[in-house]
Amino acid sequence: MKLPAFLSLLALVLLEAGTASLPKERKRRDEMHGEGDSYVVLGNYVLGPDNYDEVIDLSDYEGLMDYGDQLPEAKVTNLAPPTGISSAQSTMTPRTLSLKPTMIRPTELGVLGSPNSHGLPTCLICVCLGSSVYCDDADLENIPPLPKTTTYLYARFNRIRRIRAGDFKGLTKLKRIDLSSNSISSIDDDALRLLPALQDLILPENQLAALPALPPAIEVLDARHNQLQSSGIQPEALRALEKLQFLYLADNLLDSIPGPLPPSLRSLHLQNNLIETMQTDAFCDPEEHKHSRRWLEDIRLDGNPINLGLFPSAYFCLPRLPTGHCC
């Protein structure tokens, strides 16, 4: 009987002690909450700025961060194919690519022009600015295909030897052709004659022995430093050029003054040829004494073996005497 009574008395004492400590603990927690976030309750520990190092031992920092075997081991496995799809269906067969190139040919002439002998469009070999095409020093051996809108062509300092009949076909707006410093020795008759708008033909420093048939709209013809002979200029060929104003044939192999000359001519350069004589009607019509070539003011015959003093009646219709050796 004494033992049970003793245990009951001990239980009552402990219960009373625990009840008495509750107000103190609650008061302590209220004080910590009143001070803001300076204290944190972690289980049975009260963590604050004054006892941080007492609650958590920082000397074994690596041990604190060592999770050991707590993390599960990740295993890499293959995903099973979706339900309803067999393994044969899930395997894709790569498509075999053909190594043979496919050639695509353009159906129309592009803005860059058709391919030339180099295999590239003309405007990639030359420089195309508006209606002007510049092919200077491009190592060309032929006239390249040109855009239909070409108005001015410059193909100087190349290796062109021949101008063919179809080189300028369809270029109805072409006004100027400059082929200086090439190796042109022949021009087909229909290469230039059918160009309705051609005004300036510049051909110095080539190897021409004869002039081609020219369109009637031509105004400037420059064929200096060639191998032109008098037999290479067809009779009446120049008279038909009713708009021709400037004719430059210096430094050739001419042995006579070409003619008859058109009335529109303003300048005639024949210096450094082989001219020894001239016809009395080379410039003036001896039967028309009142006729005057008032536009022809620039005639150059210097550098020829001719003596201009021997032909005084040949200049009466001219506003100025020719330049050359006299007396």
Curated annotation (Swiss-Prot):
Domain LRRNT residue range list: 111-148
| Cell location | Secreted, Extracellular space, Extracellular matrix
Paired cysteines (S-S):
C284-C317
Q: Where are the LRR repeats?
A: 149-170, 173-194, 197-218, 219-237, 243-263, 264-285, 295-315
Q: Which UniProt keywords apply?
A: Disulfide bond, Extracellular matrix, Glycoprotein, Leucine-rich repeat, Repeat, Secreted, Signal, Sulfation
Question: What is the tissue specificity?
Answer: Ocular tissues, cartilage, ligament, skin, muscle and testes.
Positions carrying Sulfotyrosine are Y61, Y67
Under the heading InterPro entries, the entry gives: Leu-rich_rpt (IPR001611), Leu-rich_rpt_typical-subtyp (IPR003591), LRR_dom_sf (IPR032675), LRRNT (IPR000372), Mimecan/Epiphycan/Opticin (IPR043547)
Enumerate the Gene Ontology biological process terms: articular cartilage development; bone development; collagen fibril organization
User: Where is the site described as Cleavage found in this chain?
Assistant: A20, S21, G110, V111
Task: List cellular component terms (GO).
Answer: extracellular matrix; extracellular region
Q: Which residues belong to the signal peptide in this entry?
A: 1-19
Subunit comment: Homodimer.
What does this chain do?
A: Inhibits angiogenesis in the vitreous humor of the eye, and therefore represses neovascularization. Binds collagen fibrils. May be involved in collagen fiber organization via regulation of other members of the small leucine-rich repeat proteoglycan superfamily.
| Family under the similarity heading | Belongs to the small leucine-rich proteoglycan (SLRP) family. SLRP class III subfamily.
This one is known as: Opticin
Which source organism does the UniProt entry give? Canis lupus familiaris (Dog)
